[in-house]
Amino acid sequence: MSAVTRCEDGLVLRLYIQPKASRDCIVGLHGDEVKVAITAPPVDGQANSHLVKFLGKQFRVAKSQVAIEKGELGRHKQVKIIHPQQIPPEIAALTE
């Protein structure tokens, strides 16, 4: 499975998360995953909720349309974006 996969109702992303970064950004490929840096610490689900909020802004969807399918407690996650309104250039480059 690749880092970004299209499905019938959106995108499935395989992510590697770097918590406590200096800024929120999509870094690029990290092996066969997309590396995402977020400022939140990995404590009490703060990083997960911050990741959902960040991805919602990047894809211009509501937080309820961003679902963490796998990896709630780890750095390696599988996230589904339902009906993205916009695809960030870093992700668009990987889907071609």
Swiss-Prot record:
InterPro entries: DUF167, YggU-like_sf. SUPFAM superfamilies: YggU-like. SMART domains: DUF167. Disulfide bonds: none annotated. GO terms for cellular component: cytoplasm. Belongs to the UPF0235 family. This is UPF0235 protein YggU. It comes from Salmonella arizonae (strain ATCC BAA-731 / CDC346-86 / RSK2980). The lineage of its organism: Bacteria, Pseudomonadati, Pseudomonadota, Gammaproteobacteria, Enterobacterales.
